[in-house]
């Protein structure tokens, strides 16, 4: 299955093209994807900037879909606020962004993934206002797509960036994704687009032969 948008793959591909000299160090790279043309460009500090379409959640909270909070192990009094994330042209419905009252609550969530896979919609993004150097924190679950919890999710940050930039009144933020592996993504809101900035390291090289 080819996914419409994959931040990991785009970042890694750009990194390899720069590292091997197949793309000029100071030039932009264009990728043709199911989400249209996406660009990547290396910044002065070595981080790679991805230019992706924004997927903003609806600003007003909605009633959670049946079974969502129970599958996440969240009681009604936990203070969760659910926002629908429209996904144009998607056949499996919207995603859900669930804002939680604290990073501690976010870390403690232990989903029932089989139950979560039965909830209407594509995927679930959990988020809370960040601590320390991080403006916001998140986790991402997509058991219907075979990904119980993703390590770091570019597509989720296409929704998190406009959500938190609007909430905090700033155009550039730093987010931490609190999966077991964890990761840091810098984001910039640019109208209908989002800039995602990350780092990449080559850990394995191979050779394909016919």
What annotation goes with each model-predicted range?
Residues 1-210:
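Active-site proximal loop and beta-alpha junction motif in alpha/beta enzyme cores
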């Amino acid at each position: 299955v080819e996914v419409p948008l994959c931040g990991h793959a785009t970042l890694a591909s750009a990194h390899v093209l720069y590292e091997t000299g197949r793309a000029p160090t100071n030039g932009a790279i264009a990728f043709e994807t199911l989400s249209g043309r996406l660009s990547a460009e290396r910044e002065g500090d070595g981080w790679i900037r991805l230019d992706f379409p924004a997927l903003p959640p609806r600003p007003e909270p909605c009633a959670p879909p049946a079974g969502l909070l129970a599958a996440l192990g969240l009681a009604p009094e936990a203070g969760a606020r659910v926002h629908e994330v429209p996904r144009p042209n998607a056949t499996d419905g919207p995603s859900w962004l669930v804002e939680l009252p604290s990073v501690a609550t976010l870390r403690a969530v232990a989903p029932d993934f089989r139950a979560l896979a039965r909830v209407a919609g594509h995927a679930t993004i959990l988020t809370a206002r960040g601590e320390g150097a991080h403006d916001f924190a998140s986790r991402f679950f997509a058991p219907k797509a075979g990904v119980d919890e993703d390590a770091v999710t570019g597509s989720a940050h296409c929704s998190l960036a406009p959500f938190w930039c609007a909430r905090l009144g700033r155009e550039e933020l730093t987010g931490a994704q609190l999966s077991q592996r964890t990761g840091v993504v810098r984001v910039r809101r640019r109208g209908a687009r989002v800039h995602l900035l990350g780092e990449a390291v080559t850990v394995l090289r191979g050779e394909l032969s016919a």
